Amino acid sequence: MILSALALSVSLLWTDIGSKQALICEVSSLQPCLHHLPSSVRHQLPANVSELNQILGQRGAMVMAVEDSTIAGLILLSPENLPGSLSVNLSGSIVSLNLENQHELTLWHEMGHLEANRLQDSGLIDELTPYMHEWLADCYLAWRVAQEKRSLGPIWQQYNRRNIDVMQSVDTMSHWTVPILSQLLSRYSLQELIAFETFSELMSDLLPQLELPAPDSLAEFSSLIHRTFSTEVLQPLPNYMSWRKPALRSYLEPTLTKLLGEEAAEHWLIEQKMLTGNDVFPMKMSHQVEL
């Protein structure tokens, strides 16, 4: 099902998840929206609207999977909690990234969680960890963007958003899907992504080739990111986690270039001991502005 701009403006919508459907409800009309669920599904969800709102909190969206022959789950959207921009402090300067199409991208990410369950049900994935859920959901977002937007721009926006989130706080490391998105973006052109008729076809091709970060690696990246972007006064340790700096540099370069421009991004990386004067600054960002 292709969701039009008009459809996205309403507070209730059914969307396809394979052979099943998911109900999309906005929090502003949650109670009447939930009435569209059969009792067998409703009983799998929190008992009342206030409890659902409490679980959602300040998030812009949330998905709840259910066990049913025709319904895959419930997606809650809170448009007023979706950010229009993100800002981060880089060496004393506040820089910002405007976020576009957040309603669609957020919805596609939440749908991606249900699609991840489908991959497991089909046997394509044996086990789903919480981190796998997040990067699979972002891979679905990327595939959906290619199919409907015919552009890599919104995928790069999601990539940059994930980086800025961890720059702001490593509490969001569970959603840092950049190590996977970077592989997807380097492996496939826009036309190649479009050529995959289904998400499962894309993942059947991508999964055997993915290099998945181990939990220990993610913990080390988290520590290095915290030290690099913390606004606290910390003891200078220029060689801290030096073995992780080349990979982190490659993950951050596109976002830093988007925020600062190429020359300033290169200067910042040198300042942070992630780039030396003899290193080549390889990441050109023309593909980020592709619309």
Question: Could you describe each region identified by the protein language model?
Answer:
Residues 1-11:
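Classical Sec-dependent N-terminal signal peptides that target proteins to the secretory pathway
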Residues 10-64, 240-242, 246, 250, ...:
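N-terminal mature-domain "stem" immediately C-terminal to a signal peptide or N-terminal signal-anchor/transmembrane
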Residues 55-100, 117:
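Active-site scaffold of zinc-dependent metalloenzymes
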Residues 92-102, 122-131:
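Second-shell loop/turn segments in exported
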Residues 105-121, 134, 138:
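Active-site recognition of the HExxH zinc-binding catalytic motif
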Residues 127-159:
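Post-HExxH zinc-binding segment in Zn-dependent metallohydrolases
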Residues 146-277, 281-283:
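Long, well-structured alpha-helical subdomains associated
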Residues 286-291:
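Extended, charge-rich intrinsically disordered regulatory tails
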